[in-house]
Amino acid sequence: MRSSSDPASIHVVIPARFGSTRLPGKPLIDLAGEPMIVRVYEAVRAALPETVNIVVATDDERIVGSLEAYRIPVRMTDPEHQSGTDRCAQVARELGWNSDDLVVNVQGDEPLVPQPLLASFVQFCANAQAFDMATVAVPLTEVSHLTDPNVVKLVVGAQGQAIVFSRSAIPFCRDLPQNEWPLSAYLRHVGIYAYRCSALYRLTETPSCELEELERLEQMRAIWLGMPIRVFEWPEPPPPGVDTKEDVARVREILFVNASGRS
């Protein structure tokens, strides 16, 4: 058992759900010779020190079998879980992680997650004196994103904590036509999270709230509970994840170009 003077351990959980409306079996889609979930794990592993534990949390034995062939740590979780956060909490409980340990949630469909971003975010969280939860924000760079509900916006307060998240444009510029709204006033949310285990348990043990259900944003549950969410700001948007067949083709091309450049 760790003594109170020892630093908290850092763990990364990569949720990987087999079912997907647009891309069934998405974690196992081949990306330049490897399953996507393997690509994500390799990117995370390359970004972080060996002292950081990394495990994939899935709901399907096919994903388990694929990862075991690559000797990648994997845990089966309840297929009825509604979110990756729930999978993170189950893994943390089953593996007996301490209440002050840091759990980082990296999405399983982000094979191009920038390693410097991930490394800097984890260091930011590890250096924090005290926090329940943290996430990432980047500048919003396209006017079309203001009204795109798939691009989540957020407002950050003076202490570096999230005030609110929304699929709508926040803030709303009352005195300007929309084509004159300054993009510099907006931040875009990136779905990478970190939690203290104690906060993760509290969050997943609390039923969803109306704000969360209306926006379909689970982080609104933390806002509703009054849990502070620290925001790590990164200077540029990361590459988009994989949600469609077009995304698959784009990522394959990027990986091919990157591999050609190294050869």
From Swiss-Prot:
Family named by the database record: Belongs to the KdsB family.
Cellular compartments per GO CC: cytosol
Pathway stated in the Swiss-Prot or TrEMBL entry: Nucleotide-sugar biosynthesis; CMP-3-deoxy-D-manno-octulosonate biosynthesis; CMP-3-deoxy-D-manno-octulosonate from 3-deoxy-D-manno-octulosonate and CTP: step 1/1; Bacterial outer membrane biogenesis; lipopolysaccharide biosynthesis
Chief location: cytoplasm
NCBIfam families: kdsB, PRK05450.1-5
Keywords tagged on the record: Cytoplasm, Lipopolysaccharide biosynthesis, Nucleotidyltransferase, Transferase
Catalytic activity: 3-deoxy-alpha-D-manno-oct-2-ulosonate + CTP = CMP-3-deoxy-beta-D-manno-octulosonate + diphosphate
Region forming the signal peptide: none
Role noted for this protein: Activates KDO (a required 8-carbon sugar) for incorporation into bacterial lipopolysaccharide in Gram-negative bacteria.
EC annotation from Swiss-Prot or TrEMBL: 2.7.7.38
Protein name per Swiss-Prot or TrEMBL: 3-deoxy-manno-octulosonate cytidylyltransferase 2
Primary gene name: kdsB2
GO terms of molecular function: 3-deoxy-manno-octulosonate cytidylyltransferase activity
Biological process terms in GO annotation: CMP-keto-3-deoxy-D-manno-octulosonic acid biosynthetic process; lipopolysaccharide biosynthetic process
Species per Swiss-Prot/TrEMBL record: Paraburkholderia phytofirmans (strain DSM 17436 / LMG 22146 / PsJN)
InterPro entries (UniProt xref): Cytidylyl_trans (IPR003329), KdsB (IPR004528), Nucleotide-diphossugar_trans (IPR029044)
Compartments it resides in: Cytoplasm
